[in-house]
Amino acid sequence: MLLLGLLLLTALAGARLLWNKWKYRSLHLPPLAPGFLHLLQPDLPIYLLGLTQKLGPVYRLRLGLQDVVVLNSKRTIEEALIRRWVDFAGRPQMPSYKLVSQHYQDLSLGDYSLLWKAHKKLTRSALLLGIRNSMEPLVEQLTQEFCERMRAQAGTPVAIQKEFSFLTCSVICCLTFGDKEDTLVHAFHDCVEDLMKSWEHWSIQVLDIVPFLRFFPNPGLRRLKQALENRDRIVEKQLRQHKDSMVAGQWRDMTDYMLQGMGKPKVEKGHGRLLEGHVHMSVVDLFIGGTETTATTLSWAVAFLLHHPEIQQRLQEELDCELGPGASGSRVPLKDPSRLPLLTATIAEVLRLRPVVPLALPHRTTRHSSILGYDIPEGTVVIPNLQGAHLDDTVWEQPHEFRPDRFLVPGASPRVLAFGCGARVCLGEPLARLELFVVLARLLHAFTLLPPTGPLPSLRPRSHCGINLTMQPFQVRLQPRGAVAPGPSQHQ
């Protein structure tokens, strides 16, 4: 049976390749990279950038039964996602996407349509209008509580990634459900962690490339389905509680706002309507997109500052000048980040070097289009290599070096693309930037970051085979400002 399946798969692949070659014979397509095992490269975004030396910034890769187009420069990414955004606003329909998104009722994974636009409008309104007044004070409050917990562990090695993860999960729980109770935060944190681990497993990645394999036994697929059942059970419980207790015309949090606003974004007749399932998946998007991503960026920032204590010292001097010396209660200047220019530049540099979703999520062309004179047929899967664009030495001077000062001169450096751009830009970008700004300001104002005994944390990402650019686990010691620093022997 297995042999028969493999023979059939080979025959289908050959037929598909011959059909595509005949179908697109008159088009000027991007050059095709030789080989078909590209996804096995340990540092995929850097590998894809390296292919530009021979192929240019736009080329094709063969993945399974289809070719995908890779965009490796800021110019090509912005041309596709901003200037020709309608052409490139689609999402490919892959087996794991269908499972994770409840049949594409999801903003991140759903295909472009009038219903998708209405869904996006509702979720964006909930973020920007429904909780606008509570977002900043909430992030400030939870960050202060986080710093107090860290003060209780002062001087001892702390697994800062895990602490950041619980902090960002608490923020999302409060904004989405109006609740930061530890049991709920831990339940959602563990749920998201389990889901992402299952989704990024190699067996699911292979399934997306060769969908035919879903007909064969797959323990990884079974684990993913179990993680999704657990996710949906937790979210549905919260939705029931909100429906039973909410008051019409009032909203306590984003869930209230979205449940009451489902019918407000008008969708043309015949294009469907927003249902509770769309609210369900908006909640899922907020947790997946707003927990580990922000926590990982904060962790990268700490790791870079451990390697560059001179930058940390300059940041603390800037914070002392603006907020006063020591861990004072002065408010972080959220309305005018330019008052902390080095902090703003440091965040931009971390996002440039380590965009958490380095290959974004794949796009799909909704109609025939073109990039740099190359034809891009309708239905083509397109991968924006965000990290590759950030490391392009024709755009950035010494692109692999951590140099926040490059962003201190207005207009001297391009805008980073870490949150994507165009119609598919991350809706949570304002919240993520707020958290990065407040947490790093408070953390560096209250503590000096010191390495534990032993080597500094690795700045090399883990081998990239999933969605997020993760880092090696590490620990940090948080020395309260003004306290006596440890001796030199402890700074090895």
Swiss-Prot record:
Binding residues for 17alpha-hydroxyprogesterone, per the UniProt record?
R231
InterPro entries linked to this entry: Cyt_P450, Cyt_P450_CS, Cyt_P450_E_grp-I, Cyt_P450_sf
Q: Where in the cell is it found?
A: Endoplasmic reticulum membrane; Microsome membrane
A GO biological process held by the record: steroid metabolic process
Q: Which CDD domains match?
A: CYP21
Q: One MF term in GO for this entry?
A: heme binding
Annotated residues that bind heme b are located at R91, K120, H363, R424, C426
Which region is the signal sequence?
A: none
Per UniProt, progesterone binds at R231
Q: What is catalysed by this protein?
A: 17alpha-hydroxyprogesterone + reduced [NADPH--hemoprotein reductase] + O2 = 11-deoxycortisol + oxidized [NADPH--hemoprotein reductase] + H2O + H(+); progesterone + reduced [NADPH--hemoprotein reductase] + O2 = 21-hydroxyprogesterone + oxidized [NADPH--hemoprotein reductase] + H2O + H(+)
The topology of this chain with respect to the membrane is: Peripheral membrane protein
Tell me which GO cellular component terms the UniProt record holds. Answer: endoplasmic reticulum membrane
Instruction: Name where it mostly resides.
Output: endoplasmic reticulum
Any Pfam family the entry gives: p450
- Give cofactor(s), names only: heme b
Which key words are in the record? Answer: Endoplasmic reticulum, Heme, Iron, Lipid-binding, Membrane, Metal-binding, Microsome, Monooxygenase, Oxidoreductase, Steroid-binding, Steroidogenesis
* EC annotation from Swiss-Prot or TrEMBL: 1.14.14.16
PANTHER family linked: STEROID 17-ALPHA-HYDROXYLASE/17,20 LYASE (PTHR24289), STEROID 21-HYDROXYLASE ISOFORM X1 (PTHR24289:SF17)
Q: What does this protein do?
A: Specifically catalyzes the 21-hydroxylation of steroids. Required for the adrenal synthesis of mineralocorticoids and glucocorticoids.
Family according to the record: Belongs to the cytochrome P450 family.
Q: What is known of its domains?
A: The leucine-rich hydrophobic amino acid N-terminal region probably helps to anchor the protein to the microsomal membrane.
- Name this protein carries in UniProt: Steroid 21-hydroxylase
**Organism name:** Felis catus (Cat)
The root-end lineage is: Eukaryota, Metazoa, Chordata, Craniata, Vertebrata
Q: Which gene encodes it?
A: CYP21
